[in-house]
Amino acid sequence: MLDEFLGEKVVVDLKSPFVCLGTLSRIDEHFLELKGADLHDLRDTDTTRELYVADSVATGVKRNRKRVLIRRSEVIAISKLEDVVDE
């Protein structure tokens, strides 16, 4: 199922107070690789996860990493950025 997301801009919700947005470039047994990524620590802002992601959909991904590897065991959910709804 994750293969459907390869090459797409995605939102990765993590167990920790982090959210990551970027282009899913590779998947293996233990890691997801995102390129042009925004690894955001929600403790650094007063906004909620949902508002941060909705703002990123509206204004674009604020890249702060060329490449980031995320442990699959830390992932709660992954979705295409285009599938985020703001209703």
What are these regions, as identified by a protein language model?
Residues 1-87:
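Conserved RNA-binding domains used in RNP assembly and mRNA/RNA metabolism
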